[in-house]
């Protein structure tokens, strides 16, 4: 918390402690409802007393700097990150709803877990060691994209020399210099805007560039340019799968630019890693991961703009670790990590996955695991 607000920060610390104790991911503060904590994908109230008008604003202002308060009062939005001694780092979004302040706080784990501990495909360790190209990690909000990206970057940090540059809004995981030098630039703190940071990134001589998120054409153009000029560029994108990610990228650009874009992607895209979190039998969440790799055939399809054939090609074979969501879910089910109901609930093709499971030699299915906390209250 900012030094000037340390006393006010005490108001919110008990909630942050609870989130850490319960391994929660998000805290929600909204007038008229009690604070709510999300843990292992389930959201439950903390206590029963609803927050009164002005309370959320007071909590929020207690962790914001004067400049952040001015930004919020001018734009009704503010993103920030805070660090609390003995607890860790938290990402905060403050916004207005129905004329009053509301706030969401996300817990950013202090230790970056390795790829294996996150139950992610080992091929991600190979991808992050690529010398150049574009790697996208896509998924819905809260699907673990940032954590996956951090695990990949930390693997490179531990195993290869070089310069890793991240441009984030805000910084989510803190890296320490290991084999690589890792420079982290936070928008609003270390640079005035994404645009300024992206324009100057090349002058900072990076080997790897991480862009926090691609939301529009300008950022996508820079990501492709970095890959074209011999850098490894990584970023996240909001999309449900590889096909949707490619469609979204194409829709960033006018029709007149599509042919060149297809060519650029066919030459520079290395992988699209799509992720969903599913509930394991033990109540903890596991990643189901779709991986699109730029094989020769996939490159040809992208160059022709034949995006919707890609899914069929992925289903026909898992070359070098390429896999669909349904193949990932099938594997998790076969390993006894998730129930049949959970696998089918997240399948792209429920009927196809159900048939594949029925034809397998799998035994009975256990009931889904619980949240691991009291059912009524935290």
Residue spans for each PLM region:
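Short, flexible helix-loop junctions that flank or precede catalytic/ligand sites
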Residues: 5-378
